[in-house]
């Protein structure tokens, strides 16, 4: 799988996971409708299915995906929660993305 396709798949996967966790959070902490649990469950099912689309070892995918998840979570903090990330949030996200790139795109023996 190409680098761009892998990154796109990681981004969509992270959004599905974050949405699947954010909706129950709204229900539990802000008194929103219990019906939010339905799209949350569907989002988490989508998340699990998306993880299965990666053609490499599952452990490597999960480790690399964590870097993208950190980046998307900080982006969510800014765009959805309305909290501007600190310099250290941004630095940490970049470090996580560098780790993801090393894990996913390093040369491997066939």
UniProtKB/Swiss-Prot annotation:
From the Swiss-Prot or TrEMBL record, state where the protein is found.
Cell inner membrane
- InterPro entries documented for this protein: UPF0060 (IPR003844)
Cellular component terms (Gene Ontology): plasma membrane
The membrane spanning regions, by residue number, are 8-28, 33-53, 63-83, 87-107
What domain of life is recorded for the organism?
Bacteria
Report the protein name in the record.
Answer: UPF0060 membrane protein AHA_2410
The question of whether Cell inner membrane is a record keyword is answered with yes
Q: Which organism is it from?
A: Aeromonas hydrophila subsp. hydrophila (strain ATCC 7966 / DSM 30187 / BCRC 13018 / CCUG 14551 / JCM 1027 / KCTC 2358 / NCIMB 9240 / NCTC 8049)
- Which family is this sequence assigned to? Belongs to the UPF0060 family.
